[in-house]
Amino acid sequence: MRYFTLAEAQQALPEVERHLREALFHKSQSQEAQGHLDKTTQRVRDSGGARVNPSEMLSLRARRDTSISALKQALDDIEEAGAVVKDLDIGLLDFMTRYRDRDVCLCWKLGEERIGFWHGPDEGFRGRKPIDQEFLQHHHGEAPH
């Protein structure tokens, strides 16, 4: 697990945000393709064997599978950069740091201009606290010894 200073996490944010946006796009694409597949399957069931266009079904499956692979890659890229996706649907990420000799998370949500909050590892989004001078003076990005 990588530990970040606030400055390091902020510096990593543009790359991580790009990967997060890619993940959200590919998740949407895979869900859309799966929705079309589900509707077609339901239509076949409801009609007792309606005709379907096999090439269209193959194309939808390929689109879904390609999007799922791209989604997984984007999530892997976020992890490689050192961030942790906490909630993909709302674009919530954490970066680990140390504050007063304990592990805490620098917390960022898609749409926020900068990393401005932190929380304990078990507190989650609802436990977010603003980064203040006290936090800045007592946090560091070094792993515990």
PLM regions with names:
Residues M1-R43:
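Long, hydrophobic N-terminal alpha-helical segment
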Residues G35-H36, Q42, E56, V104-C105, ...:
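Alpha-helix boundary/capping detector
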Residues D65, K72-H145:
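Glycine-rich, aromatic-bearing surface loops/beta-hairpins
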Residues G48-L60:
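A short, surface-exposed helix-loop junction/capping segment
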Residues E32, H36-K39, R43-D46, N53, ...:
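Heptad-repeat coiled-coil alpha-helices
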Residues V16-A33, L60, R64-S67, L71-A74, ...:
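Amphipathic alpha-helical coiled-coil segments
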